[in-house]
Amino acid sequence: MTQSPFTLEANGLVLAVRLTPRASRTGLDGVRTEASGRPVLSLRVAAPPVEGAANAALTAFVAKSLGLRKAEVTLLSGETSRTKRLLLSGDPQTLAARVEAWLGG
């Protein structure tokens, strides 16, 4: 059974992301497993990792893809790292269903 790149919290859902900045296009690459064995959502953005541009592009892309407001997607950790944790605010079960649908499963 494949592990999920997200965990349910009382106030929403925490999504583990591996971000590739300065990509040719912004998009979702699917779920991958890091060397530590932790599953992460692999995403790419066209924005460079300069002055928070890639992080802003990431939160905007995730919000748009899941039908959320930008304010409902918060960067919890990984501001200067490729591995990040995002908090998606809202009903955890609804958010989990949206993420699963986005991942195609």
Swiss-Prot record:
GO annotation, cellular component aspect: cytoplasm
Signal peptide: none
InterPro entries the UniProt entry points to: DUF167, YggU-like_sf
Family label: Belongs to the UPF0235 family.
Protein's name in the database: UPF0235 protein Mext_2130
Protein's organism: Methylorubrum extorquens (strain PA1) (Methylobacterium extorquens)
